[in-house]
């Protein structure tokens, strides 16, 4: 996953992400970008459990803010899942899709897809 960060959302981290994406797409001319998720993700668990902000590290707090649309998708589309492991799996998969949407927000990606 491209860290779930849309361009301009968090200084530093976003600049690094944007620079890496731009370099890969424009300079290296990569043909594919792989977005990965993983099981037993502590950040996904924190997102679903709505941990108190004071219990979280600053970077995790930032990540959870960016990933909040995943929580909304879970509420809307996955309310029928009650097993915590199934909910975590669904949220991890939705987070990868969210990362893909974010990747498409980068101008260099939009230009490449239009080619």
Q: Where would I find each of the regions flagged by the language model?
A:
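Short, well-ordered beta-to-alpha junction loops that form the rim of enzyme active sites
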Residues: 38-39
